[in-house]
Structure formats: structure tokens, C-alpha cells
């Protein structure tokens, strides 16, 4: 059975965050583990409060998982502060897991902010380069790329701009696009030719 670690916030209503990830993993026959970085008191209509976990405790949770379990993939969601991002990045660099998927969370579905606005530069400098796949939707891609997205060409330009920040692949999800939902994938293909002995 594959084992996937979710690093994200806890949603007490069960509709997002760690709880949603663990349900999804289970539904697909994957063993899910979790590192909680923030406890979010929220429901379907509002975010009541957010309590961030200390960077030290975040690091200890990551250590607890990696020292005992072989992790096949890591899925990262909400990282609310620069300190949280740095703690997670430090441990990912230490353990070097394969298959790191980052879906940066900036806002709750109801629009309430879940990421400190000052944390975007830390996300770009510290977290994005660790992503095997980065999966922002249009509003997140606009924030990261610092540009407005209103067309598929804009999505492509944002994907190229974000890709240059160091992730291995990016999928800009177009569910927030007016009209048809279009996703834009940007990645690098490395070809290693076979040497022939003469």
C-alpha cells in the first residue's frame, strides 16, 4: 500500500485540509499520514480563528513520520506563515522525499485569508522550488506570479513565470476561469541520449 503524508491545516468541519486529504487517500486505497501546521476553526460559511502550530512542533511531527515510515509522496496544502514554510522546507531538504505535490492554500472557499500576506515571498523562495508538481488555481497563480489572469494565454504566461521559480512541473487549474475550465501544464522534459560504444 502506498503511503502519503499530508502537511496542511486542520479543518474541524471536515471539508478541507488534513481531514479532506485523509478521506481522499483512504478512498483511493492509500495509507494517509498527517502533519498539522495550523488548527483552523471553520465551517462552510466562515473562518472563526486560526491557531498556528510552532515551527518546532511542525518539525517534530515530520521527524516522527519519516524516522518510522517510508513515505511515497508528500502533499502540501496550507502553510500560513513564513516560519511554518521554513520549518517544512528544512525537513523536506533533510529527508528528500520523492513526489512532492504542493497545492498552495491562501484562502478558504468562503474567501477568508489562510496565509499571511507577507508569506508569499517565502513561499516563492523556500517552498515552490521543492515541488515536483505545483497545482495553484487561477487566484493563487495570480498572487504567486503577480499578474492578472483573464485568458488561457495569461494562464500559460503565469505558468511559465511560476515554473521559472524552480518547481519541476506546474498545473494552473482553470476551474475559476470564466467559460470552459482549462488547465495549463508546464514542465521540463529531460532527454538523456544513449551512448553507443564504437
Give the positions of each predicted feature.
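Short glycine-enriched, charge-decorated loop/helix-capping segments at active-site entrances
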Residues: 46-53, 112-117, 145-150
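Single conserved hydrophobic/aromatic residue that forms the stacking wall/gate
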Residues: 188-198
